[in-house]
Amino acid sequence: MKKPLNFAILKHVTTVNEACADDVIEALKGEYGTSKWLNKKSVLEALFTGQTNGFLKETRYEMVDGDLKIYFEAPPDGKEKINKYIPD
């Protein structure tokens, strides 16, 4: 059974050093590509919610061709919480 998309977004960030919304969309489009929620606005909302809840941390941001990219990581305590509450 497939995880809810918000869970998959958090789990993905635990598997990489850092990720922006575009990275997450690219990584999850194989499994969630038909979901209307796999878009930049919804993914950013999930990433910011993860940050607000203490699971993720913003690492950096940059402008690429007029597009703001905000990168997040799951620090060790965040990874631990995510992996505890969202099993593989």
What are the roles of these predicted feature ranges?
Residues 1-18:
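Short alpha-helical segments that sit at the start of domains
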Residues 11, 15, 30-34, 62:
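General structural signal for alpha-helix termini and helix-helix connectors
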Residues 19-29:
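Short acidic, hydrophobic short linear motifs in intrinsically disordered regions
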Residues 29-44:
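Short, positively charged loop/turn segments that connect secondary-structure elements
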Residues 44-51:
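Short, hydrophobic-biased segments on the C-terminal half of alpha helices
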Residues 51-62:
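A short, conserved structural fragment
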Residues 60-70:
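Short, Lys/Arg-rich nucleic-acid/phosphate-binding segment
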Residues 70-88:
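Short, amphipathic alpha-helical interaction segments positioned at domain boundaries
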